[in-house]
Every structure is written in structure tokens, then in C-alpha cells.
């Protein structure tokens, strides 16, 4: 491990630091050099040592200006020439991991080291080293990294400052990534070799899931199945089931006022809107939800008509009473009779009720005004006398009078 107290990083001052480090501050370099076999020449003159030191410094300085101790740190073969050509596999001891926070990779340009790990692996005498120490690390590719390690009294924390921002930028670290620190195993020289590594955070986000808060779009494609009403080759639209409550409400609020009736002149098209299906609709059992309103459009001579559908569109629902014998509803200028016996046969009554609720639409529904406005424009009750003659019942006179007044005139 190399400890220096200088904060100068120019080229000339860096060379002076390398010379001083070779004599004083890297003891494991001299130990390794003594343990290595001597070259062919046994000369130990100062000139020979100076030449070998300068050759080692020039070879290491050509790759990066901070590679002052990689002659011994990378290969462990001393500072002699040719030692850096061999890549030695070093056994490492894991020290600790640090999950970087947004402030660690932000604009503060510092990495906070947990106090328990800092005091255990990087002991620092703040009084003797006011400016901190320079720690040399190697990454997985063998590239050296130098960080200034110091203690901040203001926050009472151990931090790595200078050189850390360059590491974050090159490795593209983000908040949540993990930085791992380890050291070599073996003799004194191996234990002074420090290594740094990193790994990306585990991405648990589902790429197919939409971000929270964004509206869910309707499916762009729908599945079509043959629909057997009329035998005209129509299709039944089967939308996918709603995935969320928002999509369910979105489908309820669909509006088909921009529908082009000319495109539906040659076939039957089934649309779904926001009204409710009446309970007497046996042909619409395949509807995806009882909250959808289905009706069909067929071409006709005077416009688009709703053919064979028991759906009441944009009108006041007719509430059947078991005490009434007959009802007449005037919708869109057409009188519709709905005879229904109080206790008569269920099948015949249901069939007649289905035929009675079928509407012929003279104009498309999307070209009319809002039905809530039409309710406010009901005509005066001047047709009650004409329509009371159409209601007949074998019950008492009071019942006949009540039936006559129950006939609705919705001349829309």
C-alpha cells in the first residue's frame, strides 16, 4: 500500500513523488526486488539502480501518469524491465462492499466509506495526515486507480475524494450499484495490493409494465368472431377483458359519435358503449360485460337502422309493472306497443317484450343531442286523451284509468 502526503499532480512533481516513493514509502517493492533473482550483471552501483528505476518509471508512465507502483503492483516481479509483460493471477481477500447512494455518484465527487470498514482496513491518523493519504487500487482489467482518502471533521466520516469522480464517469456508476474492495493474500507485498470492482444493481423492474400514473391505452387490435344475427356475414367484436379499474371505466366512457356510417353499409357492425343491457336480451349473451351496450347498424333506404336488437338506445327505460295490461311508447315519432299480461305465459310474454322494445332508428344516434337535454324538452301532455283509448283491461275502472295515464309520450 502506498501512502503519500503530497497533493501535487503535475508531471514534474509526479516524477519527484515516484523517486521518493521508491526510496521511502513502498517497502514491499524493495523486498520483492531483493527476493527476485539477480540479473546477469551483479553490479550494484548507484548508476545501475538509477538507470533501472528510470526505465521502470518511463515504462509505467507511458500508459498512465498514476502508474507509479504498477511495476510491483501488477506483476509482483519488482521494478525491473520486462516484469509488466506477465499477468499474474493474484488471490484476493474480500474486504467489504459499498452500495453507492445518489450522493456518492452525484456532484459531491466523494465516496463515503463506512466507519467500521474504514477504521479496520484503512486506518488513518488525522493529526499526522491532515491532507489524507493516496490509495492505489487496481480494477478487474488491471488499470490503476488512485483515490485521496481523508477524514472529514465536519461530517465525521471517511471519504475518498480526488479521483473518485473519474472512476464514476468511466464505469458509469448509478445509484444502487455496488463497489467492492479487496486486497491480495500472501506475503507483505501481496497484502498491500488493493483491488476495486463494481457490479450493476439487480433490475427488478418489469419492462412490460407501464409506469405508475400513466393512463392505460385501449388495445390497438381486437379479435373478431362470426356473429349469426341476420346471416349477413357480420362480426362480433370481442375486446380483451379490462386489466385495471381505469381501463374498465375508460371503456364505459367510449363515444362512437365520430363513427362513419358509410363504412358500415355492406356489413353489420357491433359497437359497444356505456349504457346498460336490458335483462331481456338473450342474443347478447356473449357480451364481455353486462355494463356494455351493444347494438347493430344495418343499411336501409332512409338511413341507418338498428336491426333485430332488443336494445333501447338513448331513451328513458320503460319500467314494466305487473298491474299494467298494455303500454304505448312514442319514440322518434313511432308508436311502439308492448302488450304484457300480468300472469300470462312467460315465454310468449318475453318474446313479445323483446319485439316491443326493438327500435327503428331513423337517424344515427351520434347525430342527436344529449338524452339528458331531451328529457328537459318533453312535450306537454296533450296526447293523453288520444292514447287512453288504446289501453284496455278487464280489471276495475280505477285500474283502467291508471293504465291510461301510464302511457308515455316521448316525442323526441
Curated annotation (Swiss-Prot):
Low complexity: bias regions: 30-65, 387-399
Region Disordered, annotated ranges: 1-87, 374-412
Main location: nucleus
Residue spans crossing the bilayer: none
DNA-binding region: 96-200
Compositionally skewed regions (Basic and acidic residues) per UniProt: 400-412
GO molecular function: DNA binding; DNA-binding transcription factor activity
GO cellular component: nucleus
Subcellular location: Nucleus
Keywords for this protein: DNA-binding, Nucleus, Transcription, Transcription regulation
Entry protein name: B3 domain-containing protein Os02g0683500
Biological source species: Oryza sativa subsp. japonica (Rice)
